[in-house]
């Protein structure tokens, strides 16, 4: 009996290691992709690479650690969203609202950020390598005065 129990426990443990638990809510990811409306959604760690999220409502959404590489977020409302540690490599953020957003540790490598509103956003440890930034309050050392 003990041997069988140990085999079952060992099998379950190996399954957990093979299929890591994902933090995002799959229904909310689908809701976002289908409707572009997901205010307050839990999208932590979501894989949204290449997603077309033009004009998306992501106010107060939790996108901590999400992969938004090459995502189109033109005109998206990310007011008060948590993007800490998110990957926005080569993302397109023209006219996006990032008011009061947590952008700490975000990777903006090669991102296009034109006329985005970052009023009150937290921007510590962001990576702006090769990013194209125009008309936006992001500069070396933080927000422009």
Write out the residue ranges for each language-model feature.
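Cleavable N-terminal signal peptides
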Residues: 10-11, 21
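Bacterial N-terminal signal peptides that target proteins for export
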Residues: 1-7
């Amino acid at each position: 009996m003990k041997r069988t129990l140990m085999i079952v426990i060992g099998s379950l443990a190996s399954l957990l290691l093979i299929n890591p638990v994902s933090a995002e809510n799959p229904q909310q990811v689908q809701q976002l992709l289908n409707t572009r409306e997901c205010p307050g959604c839990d999208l932590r760690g979501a894989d949204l690479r290449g997603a077309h999220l033009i004009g998306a409502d992501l106010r107060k959404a939790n996108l901590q650690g999400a992969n938004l590489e090459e995502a189109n977020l033109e005109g998206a409302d990310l007011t008060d969203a948590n993007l800490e540690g998110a990957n926005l490599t080569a993302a397109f953020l023209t006219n996006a609202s990032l008011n009061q957003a947590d952008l700490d540790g975000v990777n903006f490598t090669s991102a296009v950020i034109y006329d985005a509103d970052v009023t009150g956003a937290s921007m510590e440890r962001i990576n702006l390598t090769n990013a194209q930034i125009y008309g936006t309050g992001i500069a070396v050392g933080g927000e422009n005065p």
